[in-house]
Amino acid sequence: DVIDLKDKPFIAGTMEGYFAMRMHVLVRFGKWQEIIDSPMPERPDLYCLTTSMHHYAKTIAFAALKQFDKADQEKEAFYASLKCISPNRKLFNNPALQILGVGEKMLLGELEYHKGNYDIAFAHLRESVRRCDDLHYSEPWPWMHPPRHALGALLLEQGHYEEAEEVYRADLGLNDTVPRCGQHKNNVWALHGIVECLKERNGEMEFNKLQGLLAEALSKTDLTITSSCCCRKTVSQSST
């Protein structure tokens, strides 16, 4: 009812944006079948951001399962859904289309990665990181799944340890490349990634420190984390 308030479009748009964030959670935890089984909104005109987020998530889910025909169909549906979103539509202080631009590059990156087109995939994911960094700060975050977590995980899987380490350092705020508001200090996903990198290059002193932070973070989780992103297929037990 709140979303359908004709006389309060700002409230309607904000609440609809919150509703759309459920897809971020399912992608974050790799709930591919649950994403695929999620029904599309019955009123895409009203739930326009949610509709786009469903297509984004379904593209990533089908790509992870290597069902590429369906992933490509969802990708095209994602682009079609963007046409239903007004350029003036905002989620707090960011245009909705700018926020979804982050997702566009994430879905393209993960789709191309699972197809085996790694260079193209990494180019898309790096652009997703750049676009995410360009978003205005707000709480909650305008884009909930940090693109660096996907980029780092997939770089690691292909043996690009040096770049992956820099990606995680930026995300964790261990260097000065990202403003504080864009950092995710002591984030369990990013800690898992950088510990993997340090293990590969035998950075013993820093490895021991960050592995301790990772162990502490993992003690507070209720699931097993084996990568900074569920989009990666190979797993690592970096806490051991």
What do these predicted regions represent?
Residues 21, 53, 57, 100-103, ...:
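"A position-specific structural signal for the A-helix of alpha-solenoid helical repeats
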